């Protein structure tokens, strides 16, 4: 039995979340600010449920029988800028967190005029100085609808105000805020 599965998403709220996913992308939820929808997830605290066909009502782990699914796919609605952050690589995550690392790919599904992301550190910065502000050392990149970015583990990054992003990432929720 092979057919396209429609999955129930997980809604996540945060102070920086917005209204676009709710109002323009028809993603209803109980939160005032909808920050993320996890469209494909097989995490211990979030497993999608099938909404259609013969498998309707079954959890995704029951359907594919794999609790270590490699990907997490989400939409992110940033009404405000997220904190500067970094994710661990697989080795560090396994040793310290007993999890996998987190590498991401962002597709800019929509962006307001002037939207930007933080994407690494400025050229010439070899070491983040504790004496200097992080904001002065990071690279800001203007974004527009249709842009895409690879965010390897270990790279400083942040989603800016006014960005709506489709994110494909390793199945990890490890984030270290800077």
Regions found by a protein language model. Give the residues of each.
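Transition-metal
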Residues: 1-124
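Structural beta-strand/beta-sheet cores of well-ordered domains, especially the beta-sheet scaffolds
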Residues: 36, 82, 104, 147, ...
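Gly/lys/ser-thr-rich phosphate-binding loops in alpha/beta enzymes
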Residues: 72, 138-141, 145-147
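Fold-independent oxyanion-binding glycine-rich loops
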Residues: 87-88, 111, 152-154, 168
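Conserved protein kinase catalytic core
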Residues: 93, 158, 173
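Aromatic side chains
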Residues: 107, 149-150, 176
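Double-stranded beta-helix
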Residues: 118-137, 163-178
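Conserved metal-binding segment of the jelly-roll/cupin
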Residues: 143-161, 170
């Amino acid at each position: 039995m092979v057919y396209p599965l429609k999955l129930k998403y997980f809604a996540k709220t945060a102070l920086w979340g917005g209204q676009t996913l709710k109002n323009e992308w028809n993603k209803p939820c109980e939160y005032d600010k909808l920050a993320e929808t996890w469209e494909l997830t097989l995490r211990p605290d979030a497993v999608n449920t099938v909404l259609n066909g013969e498998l309707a009502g079954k959890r995704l782990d029951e359907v594919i029988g794999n609790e270590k699914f490699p990907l997490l796919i989400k939409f992110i609605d940033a009404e405000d800028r997220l904190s500067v952050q970094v994710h661990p690589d697989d080795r560090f995550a396994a040793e310290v967190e007993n999890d996998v690392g987190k590498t991401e790919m962002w597709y800019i599904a929509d962006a307001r005029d002037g939207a930007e992301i933080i994407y690494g550190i400025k050229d010439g910065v070899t070491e983040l100085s504790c004496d200097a502000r992080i904001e002065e050392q990071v690279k800001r990149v203007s974004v527009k609808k249709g842009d895409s970015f690879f965010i390897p583990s270990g790279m400083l990054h942040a989603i800016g105000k006014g960005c709506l992003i489709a994110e494909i990432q390793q199945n990890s929720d490890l984030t270290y805020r800077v």
